[in-house]
From Swiss-Prot:
Required cofactor names: Mg(2+)
NCBIfam families: PRK00668.1 (NF001908)
CDD domains: NDPk_I
Coiled coil listed as a keyword: no
Keyword field: ATP-binding, Cytoplasm, Kinase, Magnesium, Metal-binding, Nucleotide metabolism, Nucleotide-binding, Phosphoprotein, Transferase
Active site: 117
Alphabetized SUPFAM superfamilies for the sequence: Nucleoside diphosphate kinase, NDK
UniProt gene name: ndk
Protein name: Nucleoside diphosphate kinase
Source superkingdom: Bacteria
Subunit structure comment from the entry: Homotetramer.
Keyword Nucleotide-binding: yes
Amino acid sequence: MALERTLSIIKPDAMEKNTAGAIVARLEQEGFTVKAMKRIHLTRAEAEGFYAEHRGRGFFDELVTFMSRSPILVMALEREDAVAKYREVIGATDPAKAAAGTIRKLYGANVGENAVHGSDKPATAAREIAYFFAGYEVAPSATA
């Protein structure tokens, strides 16, 4: 199976609780390689741009306000079947419904403050990684 990439965001709630290190360590234990990483504080306009597909939905303003309230940690991660595996490791969007041991179950508080964001499919991952990282910022894949 070929290597795949996905975007991970450690959201403001998890950053404020100083759980980013534990989350990154867990992702590495699960076989993800960090290909790019940066800590940034999104402006409201940047958050609106990233979540543009949700514009017009009832939760959009609250989401944008939350994501721009304090720094986040964005990462381009790589492994086989990265998107699906990441979704499995982070768990359901609602921490109350997430499986035991998943990142959202361990570190999330509610549907809005659920610790992490993850791409939902490979095409989305490519777009999301490009939103945060210029091509030269992402380490190339290892060759055999």
